[in-house]
């Protein structure tokens, strides 16, 4: 990794395209470059240099993406941003959570220590229309579909208010590189809410859900259409709130 300078960018790691695009819309100017077959967006947010990429879902992809971004951009700090599920009745869909710790699911990385963000949550500039929660985050090995699964995980990890699939390995690589980091997650589904489909069945080799396979699945289950429309609308609104929160945090570093 190159030596950090005052012009080193802020790194932003997302998991899927929808999250990345919402943040990429903030970059002006913006340029695209590739390194080792991975696409990176480089540009500025209100004059502050940033470098942005996505990993795809899952531990190994997240770890590779973190290593790649650190090597490609030599960031001075890292923002891990994207979607999450709620593990608490008090954390609602459409809200933002900035975890005060992140843990790894035991079936992914047994006996690994909890990691604490090295950038304090209080550094994030607040906006009136975005509700920000605190609480722990657990990184799991799959998309959690049913309320019963959420309750079981929450019972094992009572201090965790949200769940994702990428944050722990991303934070772990930042720790190894001695790069300050923070997590910004937007809630796509409530604690007492089942997902409209088992999206695990439609994840492609790139770690993204296949739009064509999801569309086919919905056509075969036409009664799911209203729930999918509602889910998609909320996901886009949540992606925009994630981008707003990331924007405000970047401004706080200026």
Residue spans of the language-model regions?
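N-terminal hydrophobic/helix-forming segments and targeting peptides
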Residues: 2-6
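Glycine-rich phosphate- or other oxyanion-binding loops that anchor nucleotides, phosphorylated ligands
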Residues: 7-10, 34-254
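Short, conserved "active-site rim" segments that organize catalytic pockets and cofactor/ligand binding
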Residues: 7-27, 44
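Assembly/interface hotspot detector across virion components, adhesins/toxins, and nucleic-acid enzymes
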Residues: 29-33
